[in-house]
């Protein structure tokens, strides 16, 4: 009976993530578009203190009421961070949004900032206090360990990154549709070649829509057959030639490669 109760609780917990109360509107729009307010309620803004002013630096995903998933390259041990949750516009103090200080930074032990192409661009941030879940603040689902998405699987990248190479940064959360590019294609010489590893996901490369500066650390959202959105990627890097360069897809940390690490960090901290 206890085992059955525990199992039902775990199943209920799994179903409580990745299902926004405000469903995203998903037409394909060249260059991305404003997201529907609070339709990606696990998306957070990671901000750092700059002489008393909080500045957006990266995105992230709320994966537990006390933990945010982001990219390792977003983190500097010398900075003080906070996480802003439940926000649509970064310039407006919206009702129901929260700003919570970060109490602990856990960067993957194999991350090397001088060797970005080795991967392991993943970090977890512990919040100073757990957050309550609402329609505006929800958990992102993680995929099953080892999951590999097929070529051309439809996903959406979200964030407050630049609208184009060297362009302006938006106040409003943006979304853009990206198609997954499988490893066999993305690792071809005319694409990313040996820069891309199997612990990464490529998506995009059409020369139109991509992630850009300021999106780093944010989620690649992919919908499962049951309607739940899962966070399959963490924005890691793009081409130095520009954000929307043809045959240079956005590259993401493949979350399904790090499920054991994520669970271990949360359980032991």
Swiss-Prot record:
CDD domains attached to this UniProt entry: Tryp_SPc
Q: Which InterPro entries match?
A: Peptidase_S1_Elastase_sf, Peptidase_S1_PA, Peptidase_S1_PA_chymotrypsin, Peptidase_S1A, Trypsin_dom, TRYPSIN_HIS, TRYPSIN_SER
> Which residues form each disulfide bond in the chain?
58-74, 155-222, 186-202, 212-243
Q: What residue ranges are annotated as transmembrane?
A: none
Residue stretches making up the Peptidase S1 domain: 29-267
Q: Please verify whether the record's keywords include Cell inner membrane.
A: no
Proregion positions: 17-28
Subcellular localization is given as:
Secreted
Q: Which UniProt keywords apply?
A: Disulfide bond, Hydrolase, Protease, Secreted, Serine protease, Signal, Zymogen
Q: What class of enzyme is it?
A: hydrolase
The UniProt similarity line reads: Belongs to the peptidase S1 family. Elastase subfamily.
Whom does it interact with, and what assembly results? Interacts with CPA1. Interacts with SERPINA1.
Instruction: Name it.
Output: Chymotrypsin-like elastase family member 2A
By which gene is this protein encoded?
CELA2A
